[in-house]
């Protein structure tokens, strides 16, 4: 099994990346990242994105009324980085609501690079997957609604504020 990676990024540093914009071939999806509630998931997402990991990957799993999932380097849902991260669900108050971004995994503490965006509220996933952010605008939700399987993540950029 891949080793668990733990990030030691200070909250002040994470605050500089409090907002993410996932640039797709359908438009931009802007999210607020919950770095106080899910610091490891946010650190992992930010680190991978800044390394260019997500650039050019696709949304390999899109199920209407459920989720749009991306972040697999193979485009199949079977890949990830050479590490995994722990789930952060115990003290995370965030729920799987329409527009939430959450870590995908194949079992507790197996998340790596794959994430999903919720098309609708999915309360049955609460406590199972780490919610680490949420879409900030109706415009971004509209872009999410246009995502289809195979659509491309062009890049991910960050800012401290909107």
Curated annotation (Swiss-Prot):
InterPro entries: Cyclophilin-like_dom_sf, Cyclophilin-type_PPIase, Cyclophilin-type_PPIase_CS, Cyclophilin-type_PPIase_dom, Cyclophilin_A-like. It comes from the Bacteria. It is an enzyme of class 5 (isomerase). Its EC number is 5.2.1.8. One of its GO terms (biological process) is protein folding. PROSITE patterns: CSA_PPIASE_1, CSA_PPIASE_2. Keywords: Isomerase, Rotamase. PPIases accelerate the folding of proteins. It catalyzes the cis-trans isomerization of proline imidic peptide bonds in oligopeptides. Belongs to the cyclophilin-type PPIase family. This is Peptidyl-prolyl cis-trans isomerase.
């Amino acid at each position: 099994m891949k080793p668990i990676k733990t990030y030691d990024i200070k909250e002040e540093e994470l605050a500089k990346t409090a907002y993410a914009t996932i640039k797709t071939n359908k438009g931009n999806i802007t999210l607020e990242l919950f770095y106080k509630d899910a610091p490891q998931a946010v650190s992992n997402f930010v680190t991978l994105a800044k390394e260019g990991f997500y650039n050019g990957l696709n949304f390999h799993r899109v199920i209407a009324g459920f989720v749009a999932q991306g972040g697999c380097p193979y485009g199949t849902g079977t890949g990830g980085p050479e590490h995994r991260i722990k789930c952060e669900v115990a003290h995370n108050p965030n729920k799987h609501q329409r527009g939430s971004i959450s870590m995908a995994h194949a079992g507790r503490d197996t998340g790596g690079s794959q994430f999903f965006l919720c098309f609708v509220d999915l309360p049955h996933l609460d406590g199972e997957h780490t919610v680490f952010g949420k879409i900030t605008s109706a415009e971004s939700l509209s872009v999410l609604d246009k995502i289809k399987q195979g659509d491309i993540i062009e890049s991910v950029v960050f800012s401290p504020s909107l």
